[in-house]
C-alpha cells in the first residue's frame, strides 16, 4: 500500500479540539509523522480549502441484513465520510451471532452493536418487539457480551407507548434493563419516543454514559415544556453524565422540539442517522453530513458538530485515543469534506423545514489506510 499525503488541508483533531493547517501522511494502515515518510513514490492529494477529520462514527444505524429494516454498511458509510458504525440494537440474543457472520465480519466498515433486550430484536416492521422482562435471557446476554466483547457496546430498549403499552407494563422494562446493564457493566441506549412513563421520570433511571435516544422527538412527553424551555430533570440528567443522541430516523426528529431546545443551548451530545431503508439517501435524513449541516445551520458550532460524530461516539466505544485523533501512530481512518455555500432546505417527517446556507460535502474517505471513497474532481 503506497504512502498517501493529504496536503494543505485544515485538520481538526477532536482530542485537542484544534483546527490546524497542515499535511497528513498515511503509510500502510497508520498515520505517520511527516519526517517518517518512506522514500519512494507517494500519492499526493491536494485538499486545499478542505476540512480533514478522523473518520466519522455513525452511532445509531440499522445494519443486520436478516431483518427488513436494515441498510448495507459500506454503501451508507464510506460515501459519507463514515468509517465506524454502531448498529442500533437490531438484534437480540436469538440472532446476534448471525449478524456477526452475515454483516459485521463481511463489511469493510468497522461495526459495533447494541444488543436488544428483546430476544428477537427488531425482526420485523410488521410488529414490535416484546419488551416484557419475563422474556429477557440474562444468561445468553452474559455469554454474548463475553464472547463478542469487541463488538457489543450497549444494551438497547425501546419504551414507546405503542411498544410497551399493549403489554400492560410501564417502567418495569427500563428498571430491569438498567439492572442487567449494571451486571454486564455496559451502557443502556433508551429509545424515548413518546415514552410510556413521563420523560422526566424515565431519565431519573439513567446513569452516566447511558444514552437518551431521539432527544428531539416531538409528540407525547418531550424534553421541552409548553414554554419551550428544556425541562429541569433533563438538564439535571445531562449534568450527571447522561448523553443525548439526536438519532434522526424517519420520524424521530421534529423542529418543534429541536428549535427551542437548541435556542436554549441544548445541543446533541451525539448526532446519528438511525438509517433504515426508509431514509437511505432521502429526506429527512439523506446522510450523516446532511444532518451535520442541519445542526450547523441551526447555530451549533462546527467543532461541537464534529465532536458529536467523532469524539463522543468514540468515547462511548472506549476508542477515543484511536478513532478521535489524527496523531501519528493511530489508525488511518480519515474523512475529507468541503463546506460549500448552498441554499438548502432541511425537513422533518411532518414536512416542517428550515432553510440553511451551508452544506458539509464529503470529498474522500480513507479506511485503514485505503481510499474507499473519492470525489471525481478531488485532485
Where are these regions (language model features)?
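His/Asp/Glu-enriched, well-ordered alpha-helical/loop segment
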Residues: 257-339
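Alpha-helix-loop-beta-strand connector modules within alpha/beta enzyme cores
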Residues: 53, 102-114, 180-184, 237
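Hydrophobic faces of well-ordered beta-strands that scaffold small-molecule active sites
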Residues: 57-61, 85-87, 111-115, 153-157, ...
Amino acid at each position: 500500500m503506497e504512502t498517501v499525503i493529504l496536503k494543505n488541508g485544515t485538520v481538526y483533531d477532536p482530542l485537542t479540539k484544534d483546527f490546524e493547517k497542515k499535511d497528513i501522511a498515511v503509510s500502510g494502515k497508520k498515520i505517520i509523522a511527516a519526517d517518517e515518510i518512506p522514500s519512494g513514490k507517494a500519492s499526493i492529494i491536494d485538499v486545499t480549502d478542505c476540512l480533514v477529520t478522523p473518520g466519522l462514527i455513525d452511532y445509531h444505524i440499522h445494519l443486520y441484513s436478516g431483518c427488513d429494516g436494515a441498510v448495507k454498511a459500506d454503501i451508507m458509510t464510506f460515501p459519507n465520510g463514515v468509517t465506524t458504525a454502531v448498529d442500533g440494537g437490531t438484534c437480540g440474543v436469538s440472532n446476534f451471532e448471525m449478524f456477526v457472520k452475515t454483516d459485521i465480519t463481511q463489511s469493510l466498515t468497522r461495526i459495533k452493536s447494541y444488543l436488544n433486550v428483546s430476544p428477537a430484536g427488531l425482526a420485523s416492521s410488521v410488529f414490535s418487539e416484546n419488551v416484557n422482562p419475563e422474556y429477557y435471557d440474562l444468561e445468553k446476554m452474559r455469554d454474548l457480551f463475553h464472547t463478542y466483547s469487541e463488538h457489543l457496546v450497549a444494551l438497547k430498549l425501546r419504551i414507546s407507548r405503542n411498544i410497551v403499552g399493549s403489554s400492560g407494563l410501564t417502567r418495569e422494562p427500563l428498571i430491569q434493563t438498567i439492572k442487567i446493564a449494571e451486571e454486564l457493566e455496559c451502557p443502556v441506549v433508551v429509545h424515548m419516543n413518546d415514552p410510556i412513563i413521563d420523560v422526566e421520570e424515565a431519565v431519573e433511571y439513567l446513569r452516566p454514559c447511558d444514552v437518551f435516544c431521539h432527544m428531539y422527538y416531538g409528540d407525547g412527553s418531550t424534553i421541552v415544556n409548553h414554554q419551550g424551555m428544556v425541562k429541569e430533570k433533563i438538564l439535571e440528567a445531562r449534568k450527571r453524565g447522561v448523553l443525548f443522541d439526536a438519532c434522526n430516523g424517519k420520524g424521530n426528529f421534529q423542529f418543534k422540539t429541536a428549535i427551542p431546545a437548541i435556542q436554549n443551548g441544548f445541543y446533541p451530545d451525539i448526532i446519528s442517522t438511525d438509517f433504515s431503508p426508509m431514509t437511505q439517501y432521502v429526506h429527512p435524513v439523506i446522510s450523516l453530513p446532511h444532518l451535520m449541516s442541519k445542526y450547523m445551520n441551526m447555530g451549533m458550532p462546527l467543532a461541537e458538530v464534529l465532536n458529536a460524530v467523532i469524539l463522543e461516539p468514540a468515547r462511548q466505544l472506549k476508542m477515543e485515543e484511536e478513532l478521535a485523533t489524527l496523531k501519528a501512530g493511530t489508525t488511518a481512518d480519515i474523512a475529507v469534506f468541503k463546506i460549500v455555500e448552498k441554499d438548502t432546505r432541511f425537513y422533518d417527517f411532518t414536512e416542517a423545514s428550515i432553510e440553511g446556507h451551508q452544506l458539509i460535502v464529503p470529498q474522500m474517505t480513507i479506511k485503514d489506510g485505503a481510499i474507499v471513497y473519492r470525489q471525481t474532481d478531488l485532485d
